Amino acid sequence: MRTQSLLLLGALLAVGSQLPAVFGRKKGEKSGGCPPDDGPCLLSVPDQCVEDSQCPLTRKCCYRACFRQCVPRVSVKLGSCPEDQLHCLSPMNHLCHKDSDCSGKKRCCHSACGRDCRDPARG
């Protein structure tokens, strides 16, 4: 009986430790995503955080202009953006800034010429 209890406890601990990975997040990582980082790079500014747990409430630790800081998180839709194999010859033009700018299941994805709304990649 003791052996079975220890095996059950071990299995529960193993499964519990994998839950953040199952949901695509590291332990301590808050849900949601980071807003786009379009700012100029300010190399002399030190990081204000290293991980989400250092940020208050619903803020996430995100890169902003080449350093990390606590910013309001944005909602992220399911699926990943498709790969873009093109090279842009015109100036960048952003048609969206975050997933909630896009209708239905479409995601705001980086493309060769900026961000635009696209259907998530399959697979």
From Swiss-Prot:
A GO BP annotation: innate immune response
Domain WAP: 27-74, 75-121
InterPro entries in UniProt: Elafin-like_sf, WAP_dom, WAP_four-disulfide_core
Domain of life assignment: Eukaryota
SUPFAM superfamilies in alphabetical order: Elafin-like (SSF57256)
Disulphide bridges, residue numbers: 34-62, 41-66, 49-61, 55-70, 81-109, 88-113, 96-108, 102-117
Location of the protein in the cell: Secreted
Keyword vocabulary terms for this entry: Disulfide bond, Protease inhibitor, Repeat, Secreted, Serine protease inhibitor, Signal
Signal peptide interval: 1-24
GO terms of molecular function: serine-type endopeptidase inhibitor activity
Pfam family name, one: WAP
Coiled coil stretches, renumbered: none
One GO location term (cellular component): extracellular space
Listed PROSITE patterns: WAP (PS51390)
Main location: secreted
Function statement: Putative acid-stable proteinase inhibitor.
Protein name: WAP four-disulfide core domain protein 5
Species for this entry: Gorilla gorilla gorilla (Western lowland gorilla)
Designated gene of the protein: WFDC5
